[in-house]
From Swiss-Prot:
Pfam families: MMR_HSR1. This is Probable GTP-binding protein EngB. GO terms for cellular component: cytosol. InterPro entries: G_ENGB_dom, GTP-bd, GTP-bd_ribosome_bio_YsxC, P-loop_NTPase. GO terms for biological process: division septum assembly. GTP binds at residues 32-39, 59-63, 77-80, 144-147, 178-180. GO terms for molecular function: GTP binding; metal ion binding. PANTHER family: ENGB-TYPE G DOMAIN-CONTAINING PROTEIN, MSS1/TRME-RELATED GTP-BINDING PROTEIN. It comes from the Bacteria. It comes from Xanthomonas axonopodis pv. citri (strain 306).
């Protein structure tokens, strides 16, 4: 499975619904605040240093970016949200586009919400998780930059976030800790994403794996 994910290549960028690929197959979307480490997580997932552009200026992703793994197997990088310098009219366009994508996209099989472990579950994070819940889609909370906290603080935050999302969304949301610096949690993330994409030999990550809340 990991070798298949490593085949991901840039496919297209969509600024509006007309530019989306045909609605078939399997897609996993990645959402997150502009400085949460979304692009870095995509690069680590695929073992590529520059698949998703990592910018020093938050909010540079201004469209839905599709990375193709196999025919009709895509990773989708959503625009980063919550960055004040993005013009309001552009924010409104993104909001309407993403809303339509979540409500109508049949190929969408799961959502990864990328959150800085030090600042999890902001309003937009909860909104994204709510989109998935409304569609009955599984979601996965990726608590990035775990290396910034000690092990005890990591586990405390993990359990707190798990409790909060369970109270709001039931058992459709899983959560794990992750660090791009130490590569903590990369295999767990691959298990989740690979399972949603239906890749050969990619079973979903099991309950209680290291880095995940039970």
């Amino acid at each position: 499975m990991s070798l298949l994910i490593e085949q991901a290549r840039y496919h297209l960028s969509a600024h509006n619904a007309r530019q989306l690929p045909d609605d078939g197959g399997y897609e996993v979307a990645f959402a997150g605040r502009s400085n949460a480490g979304k692009s870095s997580a995509l690069n680590a997932l695929t073992r590529q240093n520059a698949l998703a552009r990592v910018s020093k200026t938050p909010g540079r992703t201004q469209q839905l970016v599709f990375f193709q793994i196999q025919p009709e197997r895509y990773l989708v990088d959503l625009p980063g949200y919550g960055y004040a310098k993005v013009p309001q009219d552009l924010q409104a366009h993104w909001q309407a586009f993403i809303d339509r994508y979540f409500r109508t996209r049949e190929a969408l099989r799961g959502l990864v919400v990328v959150m800085d472990i030090r600042h999890p579950l902001k309003d937009y994070d909860l909104q994204m998780l709510g989109y998935a819940a409304e569609r009955g889609l599984p979601a996965h909370g990726l608590l990035t930059k775990a290396d910034k906290l000690g092990r005890g603080q990591q586990m405390q935050t993990l359990q707190k976030v798990k409790k909060e999302v369970t109270s709001r969304f039931g058992d459709s949301v899983t959560v794990q800790t992750y660090s791009g610096e130490s590569r903590q949690g990369v295999d767990e993330l691959r298990g989740i994403v690979g399972g949603w994409l239906g890749l050969d030999g990619a079973p979903p990550a099991a309950e209680g794996e290291p880095g995940q809340a039970p």
